[in-house]
Swiss-Prot record:
GO terms for biological process, alphabetical: ribosome disassembly
Source organism per UniProt: Mycoplasma pneumoniae (strain ATCC 29342 / M129 / Subtype 1)
Protein's name according to its UniProt entry: Translation initiation factor IF-3
Localization, UniProt: Cytoplasm
Chief location bin: cytoplasm
NCBIfam families: infC
One example GO MF annotation: translation initiation factor activity
InterPro entries: T_IF-3_C_sf (IPR036788), T_IF-3_N_sf (IPR036787), Translation_initiation_fac3_CS (IPR019813), Translation_initiation_fac_3 (IPR001288), Translation_initiation_fac_3_C (IPR019815), Translation_initiation_fac_3_N (IPR019814)
Higher taxonomy: Bacteria, Bacillati, Mycoplasmatota, Mycoplasmoidales, Mycoplasmoidaceae
Gene Ontology terms: cellular component: cytosol; membrane
C-alpha cells in the first residue's frame, strides 16, 4: 500500500486523508476564531501598542477607541492574558490580508512526499523482479520515493546473502532512476527494507 511521508513520519494513506480532514477542520475553526477588535474587546484597560510599535502603557478602552477613530485605525487584541491584555493600533483590513498571504506562502513551502512500496521475496523470479523494477522507475520519474521491502520467512530469513542479492539485482535495474537514501536494513527478523529516492539530474 502506498505510504505518505509527512514531516518525517510514515503514515498510511487512510490516515493521511484523516489528517488532511483534521487540518481542514482546524482551518475552519481558525477562520471562526477571529481576533477581537474595537468595541468587541471586553477589557476596560489594556496595554496599548501604537501603529509604529511604541508601547503607550496602560490605556482606558474609551480613550483607545477615540484614538483609533482619530487615526482611522482599529484596535486589535493581540494578547488576551486577563492580567496583562495587550492591544495594538493597526489597519485591520491590511492585518488580515497579510496573515492570509503568510498562510498561503507557508502552504506553498510545505512538501508532502508520497512513498510507494515494493515487496519481494528473496526467491522472486527474474521476470517478476524486472516488472517491479520497471514499475519503480515509473514512480521515480513521477517524483515518488520507493520503499523496497524483502520478506524472508523460514530458513530463508537466515540467508542474508540471498536477501542482499535480491536487493542488489533490483538496484542494478533501477539505478539510472533512483539512488539509495536509506540502505537495506533489518526491520524485523523476517523483513528488510531500503528507501530509494529519485536520482537528482
Amino acid at each position: 500500500m502506498p505510504l505518505i511521508l509527512d514531516q518525517g513520519c510514515f503514515v498510511s494513506e487512510s490516515r493521511f486523508h484523516r489528517l488532511a480532514q483534521n487540518i481542514k477542520q482546524g482551518s475552519r475553526r481558525e477562520r471562526e476564531q477571529k481576533p477581537l477588535i474595537n468595541d468587541k474587546i471586553g477589557f476596560n484597560e489594556f496595554i496599548l501598542i501604537d501603529e509604529n510599535g511604541s508601547n503607550l502603557g496602560t490605556v482606558r478602552r474609551t480613550d483607545a477607541l477615540k484614538m483609533a477613530e482619530e487615526k482611522q485605525l482599529d484596535l486589535v487584541l493581540i494578547g488576551s492574558n486577563p492580567a496583562k491584555p495587550i492591544v495594538k493600533l493597526l489597519d485591520f483590513g491590511r492585518y488580515t490580508y497579510d496573515l492570509k498571504r503568510k498562510k498561503r506562502q507557508s502552504k506553498k513551502n510545505q512538501t508532502i512526499i508520497q512513498i510507494k512500496e515494493v515487496v519481494v521475496k528473496p526467491t522472486i523470479a527474474k521476470h517478476d523482479l524486472e516488472f517491479k523494477a520497471k514499475q519503480t522507475t515509473g514512480w521515480a520519474e513521477k517524483g515518488y520515493h520507493v520503499k523496497f521491502v524483502v520478506r524472508a520467512f523460514g530458513r530463508v530469513s537466515t540467508r542474508i546473502e540471498l536477501i542482499e542479492k535480491v536487493f542488489n539485482d533490483f538496484y542494478l535495474l533501477v539505478e539510472p532512476a533512483v539512488e539509495v537514501q536509506k540502505p537495506l536494513t533489518a526491520s524485523s527478523k523476517t523483513m528488510y527494507s531500503a528507501l530509494l529516492v529519485p536520482r537528482k539530474k
